[in-house]
Amino acid sequence: MIRCHFARLLGEKKLKISDVSRDTGINRGTLTRLYYETSERYEVEVLNQLCRYFGCEIGTLLEYIEDVDGATG
C-alpha cells in the first residue's frame, strides 16, 4: 500500500490545508483526500507541486509499505 505523509508535513510546518490550497492552487478537496489518505489515485502534477512547495522529494511525501497479507493490487 502507498502511505501519504501529507498530514505529517502539514503538522511539522504548522500549516492548514487552506494555506497549501491558497499557495499552490491545488483544490482543497484534493488536499483533504491526501490528508485523510482517502485518495484512490495520485496525480503527478499535484505531487510535483507539493514536493516543490514543501521543498522535499517524493519519498518524503509518499511511502510504499508492503501489505501484511501479501495481497497485491
Task: Please report, for each region that a protein language model flagged, where it lies by residue.
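A short, Lys/Arg-rich alpha-helix, primarily the initiator
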Residues: M1-S18, D23
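Phosphate-coordinating loops and pocket residues in cytosolic domains that bind phosphorylated ligands
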Residues: R22, Y36, E63
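Recognition helix of helix-turn-helix/homeodomain-like DNA-binding domains
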Residues: I26-R41
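Short, charged recognition helix plus adjacent turn
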Residues: R33, L62-G73
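Short, solvent-exposed alpha-helical "recognition" segments
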Residues: T38-E43, G70-T72
